[in-house]
């Protein structure tokens, strides 16, 4: 570390984290509407660290080293936006060292648990109001259930899907778990998000009435 707070590997922790974020998410502009959405759903990293008595650069270092998730978003002014309960999850796990095994242990299938943990660390899991292994697992179950229901043959000439009330119950539960997403998400993910395909499209194309 130099006297200016930079490192020989390429600038301040904040600058290096911004570069890593863009490597993962690509370079897509954040509009005023995107910023406003993110302000409602996420928390700026530095004030969050202050509330928890954490050093922001230390937290950034953990993100860069793959011990904590990357920010979910960078606002247009460069502010790192993270899940409001980012550090609470670490406390629930019993500390940063215990987080990986605690997190993976929520899945019976070890490989699936590892995949979900890597997804968590990417910072791209912005699809839940509360980012937690329990809600991640439930979302995956609901998306699978909805997809399977949509793949079933329709009932006769009516064109209605079988067990439509059960399908809508899953859609309603998923709706409660997920935020609205923003236009930026559809750019970085390259198309529709799960809210588009598993909530809005189902309600539009397969209404109960």
Question: What label would you give each PLM region?
Answer:
Residues 37-59:
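Polyanion-binding surface elements
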Residues 28-40:
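Short, amphipathic alpha-helical "recognition" segments used to contact nucleic acids or chromatin
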Residues 66-67:
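The DNA-recognition helices of helix-turn-helix-type DNA-binding domains
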Residues 63:
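DNA major-groove recognition helix of helix-turn-helix
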Residues 1:
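Acidic, glycine/polar-enriched metal-coordinating patches/loops
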Residues 5-24, 30, 71-209:
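Long, charge-rich, low-complexity intrinsically disordered regions
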């Amino acid at each position: 570390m130099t006297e200016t707070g930079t490192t020989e590997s390429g600038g301040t922790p904040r600058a290096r984290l911004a570069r890593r974020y863009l490597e993962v998410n690509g370079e897509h502009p954040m509009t005023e509407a995107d910023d406003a959405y993110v302000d409602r759903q996420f928390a700026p990293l530095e004030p969050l660290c202050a509330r928890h008595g954490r050093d922001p650069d230390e937290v950034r270092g953990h993100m860069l080293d793959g011990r904590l998730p990357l920010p979910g978003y960078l606002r247009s002014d460069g502010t790192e936006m993270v899940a409001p309960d980012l550090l609470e999850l670490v406390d629930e796990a019993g500390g940063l060292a215990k987080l990986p095994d605690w997190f993976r242990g929520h899945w019976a299938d070890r490989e699936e648990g590892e995949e979900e943990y890597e997804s968590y660390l990417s910072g791209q899991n912005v699809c839940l109001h509360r980012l937690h292994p329990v809600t991640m697992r439930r979302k995956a179950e609901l998306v699978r259930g909805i997809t399977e229901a949509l793949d079933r043959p329709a009932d006769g000439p009516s064109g209605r899907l079988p067990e439509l009330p059960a399908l809508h119950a899953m859609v309603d539960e998923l709706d409660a778990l997920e935020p609205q997403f923003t236009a930026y998400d559809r750019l970085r993910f390259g198309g529709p998000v799960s809210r588009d395909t598993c909530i809005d499209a189902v309600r539009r194309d397969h209404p109960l009435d």
